[in-house]
Every structure is written in structure tokens, then in C-alpha cells.
Amino acid sequence: ARHGKLDGLALLRAAIEWEFPGRIALVSSFGAESAALLDMVSRVDPTVPVIFLETGKLFGETLDYRDALIERLGLTDVRDIHPDPAELETADPAGDLWSRDPDACCHVRKVVPLARALTGFDAWISGRKRFHGGDREGLTYIEADGAHIKINPLAGWTRDDIETYYEVRELPRHPLFEQG
């Protein structure tokens, strides 16, 4: 991983422009910390595909925030990815699988659709960070992920780094973050 020591923006530039041109996507939840990475990617290349998993369980505020960030950052290829309706009908006919089996819900609403969406890409960009804890504490900047390479440009960022980036870049906050 010859680019593993670069700062986040430099790592993104290397991955997007040199290592995987036209073969890399960003996966984003458009959640509370997402604007930082979306902004960084848009600064390198606003045409990079952004994969948004529309699970059918998201708050309206998240969808509004997604739309606002797309416009503000000039993102030109945001792809709303949905679970397969037939798979949902089989696995979660009542729409309450999340309350009975969160792992199965995540599988049908996120894992399977993401795998389909990543077909045709060699690499993808993730906003995961070590400070989120658990199995992320040992997160590296570049990792193998099955048939793909996963780029984690914010792996070493702290909460303060995120706050500073939002302030310096004057990024809007997620409406639910603002509500506490």
C-alpha cells in the first residue's frame, strides 16, 4: 500500500486519479459525518459515483440532506441503491425485520444491494474511522475487501478533525445532528 501514509485528500487524489480512474466509487450514508468525505471527493472529482443505500428505513431529513449536499457539492453521479423488492417481500414482508433480527435486516437492505452496486468497480471509498471503536480500532487506510480494494481516507481522523473540517469548509450539518 504505497499510498498508506498520505493525508486523506492526497490519498483520495491518488486513488481516484492514479490508481483506479473510472473504477472507484464512494459509498455514503449521507449521515451526520458524511459531508466531510463527500466534500473531499467533490474537490478531487465531482463525477466520482456516489452509492447511497436507500434502505427504505431512512428519515426524511436524511433524504433532504442528501439532496442539499448533492447540489452544494456539485456531485453529478449519486446512485440511489434500493433493496430488491422480491428479496424484501421474502425476508421482511412486514417491514419489521430490524426489530427481530438486525443482522438479517442489514444483510437484505445493505449488504446485498451494496454488493450489486459495486459490480464493475475495482475499489470503493468508505468514511469509516477508528474512533468509532469496535472492530474499527485497527482500521487501515487501504484494505482488501473481497474482490475490491477499500479506501478509508478518514481512518485516522478524530472527532476534532471532523469538527475542524466542517468549520473550515463551512459545511452544513445534518438536520438530525442539529436537533441533538
Question: Where do the model's predicted regions map?
Answer:
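Nucleotide-activated chemistry modules centered on ATP-dependent adenylation/adenylyltransferase
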Residues: 1-180
